[in-house]
């Protein structure tokens, strides 16, 4: 599949925004082809979840030492194999806007955080919605991604999601000229 010119650059910037909070054990929700390990030092444990089987097959070829699971976040619970594990870092990079029930997935993620672990979320801002539509039309972004957006979350709604599942918001910031936002929550001990 040909990748639109700006999609990879934007993905790189998302990862760079998250790197300061990434620890040695990572659950990457919406991992795609598992590009996150390219941006961080070697990890003790990396587990990727994604809905797209083709992406997971490529990820498994690139990283045979890591675990990958197919999962539709709107229709399924996390794999039972993960329920006894705890992760220092859980990422949801550009995922929540694709979900009909983001609270369900944030709650499941929070349950798998280790004490003092971080949940890192990036999502487009309302400004980026229109920019994304124009960019997709021009072939700069994936057209499918725009069509799949089910919700637009702002700072208040993201903060509410984190607080509702018992996380303390430690960082919120916009980046990429206000088109994306990063929120980091820490599990309360």
Region roles according to the model:
Residues 98:
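Histidine-centered divalent metal-coordination motifs
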Residues 104-115:
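A short glycine-rich, Lys/Arg-flanked "PGG" loop and its adjoining helix->strand segment in the class I
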Residues 120-141:
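Conserved class I S-adenosyl-L-methionine
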Residues 1-85, 89, 103-106, 146, ...:
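Conserved N-terminal segment of class I S-adenosyl-L-methionine
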Residues 185-189:
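C-terminal beta-strand of the catalytic ATP-binding
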Residues 89-95:
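A short beta-strand submotif of the Rossmann-like class I SAM-dependent methyltransferase core
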Residues 77, 116, 127-129:
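Feature marks short, surface-exposed loop/turn motifs that line or immediately flank catalytic pockets
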């Amino acid at each position: 599949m040909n990748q639109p010119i700006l999609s990879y650059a934007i993905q790189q910037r998302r990862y760079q925004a998250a790197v300061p909070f990434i620890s040695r054990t990572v659950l990457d929700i919406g991992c795609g082809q598992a590009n996150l390990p390219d941006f961080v030092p070697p990890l003790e444990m990396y587990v990727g979840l994604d809905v797209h089987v083709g992406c997971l097959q490529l990820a498994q070829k690139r990283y045979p030492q890591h675990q990958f699971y197919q999962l539709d976040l709107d229709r399924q619970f996390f794999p039972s194999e993960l329920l006894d594990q705890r992760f220092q870092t859980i990422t949801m990079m550009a995922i929540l806007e694709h979900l009909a029930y983001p609270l369900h997935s944030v709650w499941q993620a929070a349950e798998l955080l280790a004490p003092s672990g971080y949940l890192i979320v990036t999502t487009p801002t309302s400004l980026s919605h229109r920019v994304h539509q124009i960019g997709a039309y021009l072939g700069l972004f994936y057209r499918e991604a725009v069509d799949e957006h089910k919700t637009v979350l702002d700072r208040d709604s993201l903060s509410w999601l984190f607080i509702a599942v018992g996380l303390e918001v430690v960082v919120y910031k916009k980046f990429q000229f206000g088109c994306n936002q990063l929120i980091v929550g820490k599990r309360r001990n």
